[in-house]
């Protein structure tokens, strides 16, 4: 199995001004491509050969294979959750109902998710995930980790590695996080539920 780059459903400049073309060019075109290339060179001849990225993340111990598989999975989910002009500015349907049930309101959820994103020390990810019973969880994952490792299904992820925002927001992580809400494609996120 060869791991491949996800195809972006938008042009590299389509998310401006939230995410600049320069950031997409580096973040997607260079960082993610490097993780994909690394994974393709690390996996052959190992017990992970032929496994999906999700299966590798769920079972691999810490190390190069896990780190690169985690970042391929994380970035694929991340880049595919955006749209230049999303149809909705908050989730509806089953996801909207689950957010209200588990967080009280969409605004409460955003507050908690922003706090997790901004409060993560160092590099990593904030995730909204669902467990096998349908309950939603917000988690902070360090480095290349993903909620799949804990048996959760990731729905929405914010990348808070500095490479995700430094060209556009410098050290203002909170500004980056607050702007991302403007480009979330809630239809894509809900389909992951």
From Swiss-Prot:
Domain of life (superkingdom): Bacteria
Bound cofactor: record note: Binds 1 Fe cation per subunit.
PROSITE patterns cross-referenced by the UniProt entry: SOD_MN (PS00088)
Cofactor(s) the record lists: Fe cation
A molecular-function term among this protein's GO annotations: metal ion binding
UniProt keyword annotations, A-Z: Iron, Metal-binding, Oxidoreductase
EC main group: oxidoreductase
Entry GO CC: cytoplasm
UniProt key word ATP-binding: no
Residues reported to bind Fe cation: 27, 75, 159, 163
Reaction(s) the record says it catalyses: 2 superoxide + 2 H(+) = H2O2 + O2
UniProt keyword Transmembrane present: no
Enzyme Commission identifier(s): 1.15.1.1
Quaternary data: Homodimer.
Function of the molecule: Destroys superoxide anion radicals which are normally produced within the cells and which are toxic to biological systems.
Family: Belongs to the iron/manganese superoxide dismutase family.
Name of the protein described by the UniProt record: Superoxide dismutase [Fe]
Originating species: Bacteroides fragilis (strain YCH46)
Gene transcribed to yield this protein: sodB
């Amino acid at each position: 199995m060869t791991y491949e780059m996800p195809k972006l459903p938008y042009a590299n400049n389509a998310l401006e001004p939230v995410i600049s073309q320069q950031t997409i060019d580096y973040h997607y075109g260079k960082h993610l491509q490097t993780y994909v290339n690394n994974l393709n060179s690390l996996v052959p001849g190992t017990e992970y050969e032929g496994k999906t990225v999700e299966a590798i993340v769920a079972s691999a111990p810490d190390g190069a294979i896990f780190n690169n598989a985690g970042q391929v999975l994380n970035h694929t989910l991340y880049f595919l959750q955006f749209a230049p002009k999303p149809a909705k500015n908050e989730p509806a349907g089953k996801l909207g109902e689950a957010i209200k049930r588990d967080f009280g309101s969409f605004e409460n959820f955003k507050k908690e998710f922003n706090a997790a994103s901004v409060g993560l020390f160092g590099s990593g990810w904030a995730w909204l995930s669902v467990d096998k019973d349908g309950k939603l969880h917000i988690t902070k994952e360090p480095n290349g980790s993903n909620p799949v490792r804990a048996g959760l299904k990731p729905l929405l992820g914010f990348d808070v590695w500095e490479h995700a925002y430094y060209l556009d927001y410098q050290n203002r992580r909170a500004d980056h996080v607050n702007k991302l809400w403007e480009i979330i494609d809630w239809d894509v996120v809900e389909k992951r539920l």
